[in-house]
Amino acid sequence: YVDDSNYMNPQEWHDKIVQHNVTIWNSVPALRNLYLTYLKENGKVYKESIRLSLLSGDWIPKEMPEDILNYNKKEQIICLGGATEAAIWSIAHEYKGLETWWNSIPYGIPLRNQKFFVVDENGEDCPDWSQGKLWIAGNGLADGYLEDSVLTNQKFFYSKLHNCRVYD
């Protein structure tokens, strides 16, 4: 493990990756970017033991997956998302290359036992490829907020249209 005094030090991460042949990277995109910048600025060799990158917790810059693959073409990149109120990870996109028409890395498809609905301001399903807000449903939903029934009732409710409880 990286000790508390070095948890934001990419040199320390690199040393641990090399020392322990780390195979999985799991972080927010900003930390991954910090590591990639460290490698580039210091002429460090990327440890190809990393076979899987899990990126979540924030928007993933469009160029980041390609930056990773420039170091290791065999690395699998999974972009994850969701809400703390819904099992933290509830949607995933396996990166297979950048499409020129993308404005951003796609949010992905629901993980097993999870559902996503893109709805309008009336809670009606939006047509494919249109904007709306996301409702999350499935086995990963929390019961609600501890000792906050008002917020729980605002954010968690039953959707008659979808015949299930959702998180807004």
Walk through the language-model features, giving the residues of each.
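Conserved AMP-binding/adenylation subdomain of ANL enzymes
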Residues: Y1-T23
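Activation segment
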Residues: D3, N26, Y35-L36, M64, ...
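Conserved AMP-binding
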Residues: S5, T84, G138
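Short, solvent-exposed helix-helix connector turns and helix-capping sites enriched
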Residues: N9, L39-K44, E147-D148
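Gly/Ser/Thr-rich phosphate-binding loop
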Residues: I24-N26, L36-P106, P110-K115, N122
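AMP-dependent adenylate-forming
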Residues: W25, Q76-C79, E94-D168
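Alpha-helix capping/helix-boundary segments
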Residues: A30-R32, I60, L141
